[in-house]
Design a protein with these regions (language model features):
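Cleavable N-terminal export/targeting peptides
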Residues: 1-7, 206
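Residues that define the transmembrane beta-barrel architecture of outer-membrane proteins
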Residues: 8, 27-31, 82-88, 106, ...
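Flexible, solvent-exposed coil segments and beta strand-coil junctions
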Residues: 9-16, 65-74, 130-138, 176-182
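Residues on the lipid-exposed face of transmembrane beta-strands in outer-membrane beta-barrel proteins
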Residues: 12, 16, 33-37, 90-94, ...
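Sequence/structural signature of outer-membrane beta-barrel proteins
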Residues: 15-21, 54-56, 97-99, 117-121, ...
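Extracellular loop and loop/strand-boundary signature of outer-membrane beta-barrel proteins
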Residues: 17-21, 73-80, 97, 138-144, ...
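Gram-negative (and chloroplast) outer-membrane scaffold detector with strong preference
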Residues: 37-131, 198-206
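Predominantly the C-terminal beta-signal and adjacent terminal strand-loop region
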Residues: 55-60, 76, 154-206
Length: 206
């Protein structure tokens, strides 16, 4: 008897991302492209690439005078920021209900993995502050920066069978920071803190 080969799926989706980080709340639109290798009917490994449109947000910051006799003693200014995410992730997929090739109309699954987040942030300040006279906050430094962070990636999803080997899926995802690398251009050092709603198509090659 010849043993059947394990199956492969290719999937793509549209994603709405909401950043929940303090001082960095924004919404962005993105896409994920992924491959899945099905080891058993309920277990699979995945690899995905995702990218998002820039998210924009603003914060009012205060620079304080070094000398208490300076007038004014403090100056407020606006930091306008743009933050963009790209990510690759490797992980595991488990079906709680159904299977990758289930004939049932409805599947439920979860995923867990580790990712590498590539981010670019750019900050513009509403006015120039003389740093010889005033002390500026450490966060949201003017200029741009690229940074990387490890993430712990979780998702809960459902699938609806549309036809032979074609499934429509929806997922709730999140990325949690798995490494600490303070970036002075960010307002929140615990970036990313995000929630995503994804919807797309998975095609099975059996």
């Amino acid at each position: 008897m010849v043993k059947a080969q394990n199956a492969v799926s290719i999937a793509t989706d549209l994603s709405v991302l909401r950043s929940l980080s303090e001082g960095q709340r924004f919404t962005a639109i993105g896409q994920t492209v992924q491959a899945q290798y099905h080891f058993t009917p309920k277990e699979a490994g995945y690899a995905w690439v995702s990218y998002y449109s820039p998210g924009k947000y603003k914060n009012t910051l205060t620079a304080t005078a070094k000398d208490p006799l300076t007038t004014p003693a403090a100056m407020n200014y606006m930091a306008s920021s743009e933050l963009r995410f790209r990510q690759i992730s490797l992980g595991w997929k488990h079906y709680f209900k159904g299977a990758y090739d289930s004939e049932d109309p409805f599947n439920i699954y979860g995923t867990a993995g580790f990712g590498l987040l590539f981010s670019k942030v750019q900050n513009t300040h509403s006015q120039a502050i003389d740093t010889a006279v005033y002390i500026k906050p450490m966060q949201s430094v003017a200029g741009s920066d690229d940074f990387r962070r490890l993430t712990f990636d979780l998702a809960l999803g459902t699938e609806l069978k549309l036809g032979a080997g074609i499934y429509f899926y929806t997922e709730l995802r999140t990325w949690l920071p798995a490494s600490s690398n303070p970036a002075p251009h960010l307002f929140d050092k615990y970036t990313p803190q995000v929630a995503m709603l994804n919807g797309g198509i998975r095609i099975l090659f059996d």
